[in-house]
Design a protein with these regions (language model features):
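C-terminal substrate-recognition "lid" of short-chain dehydrogenase/reductases
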Residues: 201-228, 233
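Rossmann-fold cofactor-recognition segment
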Residues: 47-61
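A glycine/serine/threonine-rich, flexible loop-to-helix segment
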Residues: 173-196, 235
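Catalytic loop of short-chain dehydrogenase/reductase
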Residues: 89-104, 108-110, 117, 121-162, ...
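Conserved NAD(P)H cofactor-binding loop of Rossmann-fold oxidoreductase domains
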Residues: 77-87, 230-231
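Conserved glycine-rich Rossmann-like NAD(P)H-binding loop of the short-chain dehydrogenase/reductase
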Residues: 26, 30-43
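N-terminal Rossmann NAD(P)H-binding glycine-rich loop of SDR-like oxidoreductase domains
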Residues: 14, 21-23
Length: 235
């Protein structure tokens, strides 16, 4: 699928991976890109092809109204996690925090369920999971569980959605604004998090966004996961 003249929706499109995806979509000639988040005013890009919309992926009524306003479109991308990400040992983890990690699944389920009605039959969907979904490491039990559920969900509905394609992008450790750490603490965190990887650095949001563009454009892939992880899976 060529991006030129296409109408594309990006959930979580106001920072990090989502924002970088929007930049690439605009650079590649998309006719209209909708950046959806709970705080769309964070986006500083001002282009006539870019439309900022406010919505919460966990609010079903909000999503129904959003898709009704937008109407027919060609591509659905969601990088929005929809909730918190509990980290740490499972046996000492706050169980509500663990349960809330699955908001990622409910958010994706909602955008697919309510978004597919107006999606072109030649269109496609790209969701973002994460390397811990298939290569768990200590302290990542909540992220691994939720990510695994997301990947199972996407594959389970691949046949039902066809001819619409659906694929997953699985990032490893990525340096994005989601991390609250600053300065040396931030540098040390990413160094320690990637020391066992084959590529010993954090990835960038742009590197993940390029994979999303690939998944959109390549018409011979569906129901699969593309790893952008610096070798996390093999570490």
């Amino acid at each position: 699928m060529k991006l030129k003249n296409k109408k594309i929706i990006v959930f979580g499109g106001t920072s990090g991976i989502g924002l970088e995806t929007i930049k690439l979509l605009l650079q590649n000639g998309a006719a209209k890109v909708y950046a959806i988040s709970r705080n769309p005013k964070k986006v500083k890009i001002r282009k006539k092809q870019l439309v900022l919309e406010k919505a919460d992926v966990l609010d079903e009524n909000s999503l129904k109204a959003l898709f009704k306003r937008i109407g027919k479109y060609d591509v659905l991308v969601s990088t929005a996690t929809g909730g918190e990400r509990a980290i740490g040992p499972f046996l000492s983890m706050d169980m509500q925090g663990y349960k809330n990690s699955f908001d990622k699944l409910w958010g994706y389920a909602n955008v697919v369920r309510y978004g597919v009605k107006n999606l072109s039959k030649s269109g496609n969907i790209v969701l973002v999971s994460g390397s811990p979904a298939r290569k768990p490491k200590p302290g990542f039990v909540a992220i691994s569980s939720a990510g695994g559920a997301v990947e199972a969900f996407a594959r389970a509905i691949t046949h039902e959605l066809a001819p619409i394609r659906i694929n997953l992008i699985s990032p490893g450790v990525i340096d994005t604004p989601m991390s609250p750490l600053k300065g040396k603490a931030r540098k040390d965190f990413y160094k320690n998090s990637t020391k066992d990887n084959i590529i010993k650095r954090a990835g960038t949001a742009n590197e993940v966004a390029k994979a999303i563009i690939f998944a959109i454009e390549n018409e011979f892939i569906t129901g699969t996961t593309i790893d952008i992880d610096g070798g996390w899976i093999l570490s």
